[in-house]
Curated annotation (Swiss-Prot):
Keyword Cytoplasm: yes
Gene3D superfamilies for the chain: Isopropylmalate Dehydrogenase
UniProt-recorded name of the protein: Phosphate acyltransferase
Origin organism lineage: Bacteria, Pseudomonadati, Pseudomonadota, Gammaproteobacteria, Enterobacterales
Coiled coil location: none
Organism: Photorhabdus laumondii subsp. laumondii (strain DSM 15139 / CIP 105565 / TT01) (Photorhabdus luminescens subsp. laumondii)
Length: 345
């Protein structure tokens, strides 16, 4: 694939262009095939590009927008009044075929609502799901979905998520015959809500899915499964809890001790050595390195970045979009659904 064009909602996120513009330039510098359509308010963005490398600027196009979707906007109202916003225009570029993917750090509810409104759903998918790829303790990666797009999911939706997650594990992560599990409150078959148990029964009957059973929340990072499926409520709470805990641990490892005078010189050396070892061992779990949730189930690629993402994290979201485009994820999901998805009555 030679043409690789992405649309960036440059006004989105807690920090807006202060993060998205530098991240865009970094992404361009690391990928010579990449072209970016930077959607935003010209008067704000143009001054930030004045001293940029001319070669990078030749692969960057500023697409004017008039307004920004507020982070605290109510989705229904914001969607009705979305014309002229950077988010809507970025999605329009995907819909028209001018861009192959959209990346935004904006209001999650509005982004999901607009995406479903403007981009066609893949046949056989009732509702799209938010998915991310997490590193695990086996130095591999686990596909996790749904992360908040759907609070209530019936068994059929969970099965659809499992199929989409399996495709992602194969095509993006590169896992052969990925192991698929359902997030539950126990590993026994009798545990959990009816929708989870019903989904398990269906998944066992699909020959193209390597279903291995239930996993509990404390096994998210163990690498026992390549795909972990759950409803959006459980997934969002689990992800946010895990990210918060990891950030606290990493900050403690990097922080200086305020009581250094009480340590002997030998203990200080040992402490620094331990910090380096632990950071090297667990640094790959830093949430900034896997920022970006892909909205699966649409004929179009949409990546949702954390609103509080820094430059490094937003660049990671751009790179995730590149991977999804290169692997032609929507087409591969559609092809798998034709053969794997149980037909509805």
């Amino acid at each position: 694939m030679t043409n690789l064009t992405l649309a960036l909602d440059a006004m989105s996120g807690d920090f807006g262009p202060r993060v998205t513009v530098p991240a865009a330039l970094q992404a361009l510098a690391s990928n010579p095939r990449l072209k970016l359509l930077l959607v935003g308010i010209p008067d704000i963005i143009s001054p930030m590009l004045v001293n940029s490398d001319t070669e990078l600027l030749s692969r960057l196009q500023l697409v004017p927008a008039e307004r920004v979707v507020a982070n605290d906007a109510k989705p229904s109202q914001a969607i009705r009044n979305s014309r002229g916003t950077s988010m809507r225009i970025a999605l329009d570029l995907v819909k028209s075929g001018e861009a192959q993917a959209c990346i935004s750090a904006g209001n999650t509810g509005v982004l999901m609502g607009l995406s479903k409104l403007m981009l066609k759903s893949i046949e056989g998918i009732e509702r799209p799901a938010l998915m991310t790829v997490l590193p695990n303790l086996k130095q591999r990666q686990t596909v996790v979905l749904d992360l908040g797009a759907n609070v209530n999911c019936d068994s059929r939706m969970l099965v659809q998520f499992a199929i989409m997650g399996s495709v992602m594990a194969e095509e993006v992560v590169g896992v052969v015959n990925p192991a698929v599990a359902l997030l539950n409150i126990g590993t026994e078959e009798s545990k959990g809500l009816d929708n989870i148990r019903e989904a398990a029964t269906i998944l066992k009957r699909i020959p193209t899915i390597n279903y291995i059973g239930y996993l509990e929340g404390d096994e998210l990072l163990t690498g026992k499964s390549d795909v972990l499926v759950c409803d959006g409520f459980a997934g969002n709470v689990t992800l946010k809890t895990m990210e918060g805990a990891i950030r606290v641990i990493l900050s403690l490892l990097k922080s200086s001790d305020g009581q250094k005078k009480k340590f002997s010189w030998l203990l200080r050396i040992v402490k620094k050595w331990l910090q380096k070892r632990m950071t090297k061992r667990f640094g790959h779990l830093n949430p900034d390195q896997y920022n970006g949730a892909c909205l699966l189930g649409l004929y179009g690629i949409v990546i949702k970045s954390h609103g509080a993402a820094n430059e490094h994290a937003f660049k990671a979201a751009i790179e995730q979009a590149v991977q999804a485009v290169e692997r032609q994820v929507p087409d591969r999901i559609a092809a798998r659904l034709e053969t794997a998805l149980p037909k509805s009555d």
